[in-house]
């Protein structure tokens, strides 16, 4: 078991250094977990860099830390998104899905529709249903909501049942968050019920319909 000693005078700087200087996978995970737990904006660049590392444990801790920091993360992460590192992009998609910032709308739509990883498509579909529309003007929100509705309708026909399941969850969240779309989504779920063959997805559709009554 690795032990990480951190000076209390400036723990953020010390933990950033610990992340950068970690000489084992275990030390890296521990340092990232400790840094993420501080919930300090100064940690955003380092936590973003960790998403590029080939260390899933550290990446999960970084994702959790970035989500906890909320919308303050979005501008930096969008600007520094590594389009050539698939792993980093996949982890970043999970961050955006967890934060719910509509500034990441285009990225989430693209991920939900096109990403080759079912886990990324699933995360993006769930995230699309939980965007914070209050951050947009009414006109912007209406346009974005229509985009999300169309995207989730498409993703609800994905070849992988786990992605379809996530799309149903996304549609339910969208309906509960946007009253004007509730009837449309209810009818869409009714139509999807007639097309779905997977029992677990059918059960999720049924539960969503119950929540929208």
Q: What residue ranges belong to the model's regions?
A:
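Structural detector for internal amphipathic alpha-helices that build alpha-solenoid repeat scaffolds
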Residues: 1-7, 17, 25-40, 45, ...
């Amino acid at each position: 078991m690795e032990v990480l000693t951190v000076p209390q005078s400036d723990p953020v700087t010390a933990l950033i250094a610990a992340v950068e200087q970690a000489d084992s996978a275990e030390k890296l995970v521990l340092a990232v977990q400790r840094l993420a737990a501080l919930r300090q904006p100064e940690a955003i660049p380092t936590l973003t860099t960790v998403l590029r590392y080939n260390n899933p444990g550290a990446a999960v801790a970084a994702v959790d830390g970035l989500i906890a920091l909320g919308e303050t993360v979005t501008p930096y992460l969008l600007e520094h998104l590594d389009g050539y590192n698939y792993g980093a992009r996949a982890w970043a998609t999970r961050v955006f899905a967890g934060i719910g910032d509509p500034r990441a709308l285009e990225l989430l739509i693209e991920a939900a529709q096109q990403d080759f990883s079912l886990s990324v498509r699933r995360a993006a579909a769930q995230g699309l249903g939980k965007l914070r529309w209050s951050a947009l003007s009414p006109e912007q929100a209406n346009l974005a909501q229509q985009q999300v509705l169309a995207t989730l309708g498409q993703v609800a026909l994905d070849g992988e049942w786990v992605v379809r399941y996530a799309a149903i969850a996304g549609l339910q969240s969208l309906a509960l968050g946007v009253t004007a779309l509730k009837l449309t989504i209810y009818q869409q779920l009714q139509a999807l019920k007639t097309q779905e063959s997977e029992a677990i997805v059918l059960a999720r559709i049924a539960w969503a319909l119950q929540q929208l009554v």
